[in-house]
Amino acid sequence: MASALAASTAVCSSPLASASASASSARRLRAVPPSRGIRYQALRADSGFAGNRRGGGRGASVVCAVQGQDTSIQVPEVTKSTWQSLVMESELPVLVGYWATWCGPCKMIDPVVGKLSKEYEGKLKCYKLNTDENPDIASQYGVRSIPTMMIFKNGEKKDAVIGAVPESTLIASIEKFVER
């Protein structure tokens, strides 16, 4: 065993193997360009633009903010205890958005649902149901992925739209069930 180890060590450390290994390593090292570090330009507080404005180069982006105003419309939550009265017994069609706090696409579509709730005020009610807190209702209606938007009318599930879809897709679904 010791002689086999010595033989393999002798083969690995032969001058010919070392010379060819160091030559190929040197070739590989020369192929990598030297690092110049990471460069960045900090945003000025009074500027709405990132990056070099004159150059109009890559990575420039616009940063928008509304100061002192919350422009989003909060969609009320429905729970297991309020489901019957708010959704099943509603006189108007109801759009229910199934969501979870950890779901990125749910956060993307939430402002769209808020906007639609304002546009269809008096014709449609909009609620959201947290599937983590109310798994019974989600499984009762076959929700397998979120976000899922369901439309209920007269206590019956009428339509479902799955995913963070464009506003026009939700409008097309809503228009089938609202009074004109």
Curated annotation (Swiss-Prot):
Domain of life (superkingdom) = Eukaryota
Keywords from the named record: Chloroplast, Disulfide bond, Electron transport, Plastid, Redox-active center, Transit peptide, Transport
Intrachain disulfide bonds: C103-C106
Would the keyword Transport be found if you checked this record's keyword annotation? yes
Give the main location. plastid
**For the Thioredoxin domain, which residue ranges apply?**
65-179
Site feature: Contributes to redox potential value: G104, P105
**GO-annotated molecular function:** protein-disulfide reductase activity
Q: Where are the transmembrane segments?
A: none
Q: Where is the transit peptide?
A: 1-64
What is this protein's function? Probable thiol-disulfide oxidoreductase that may be involved in the redox regulation of chloroplastic enzymes.
Identify the NCBIfam families for this entry.
thioredoxin (TIGR01068)
Q: Which family would the database say this protein is a member of?
A: Belongs to the thioredoxin family. Plant M-type subfamily.
* Descriptive protein name: Thioredoxin M2, chloroplastic
Q: Which organism is it from?
A: Oryza sativa subsp. japonica
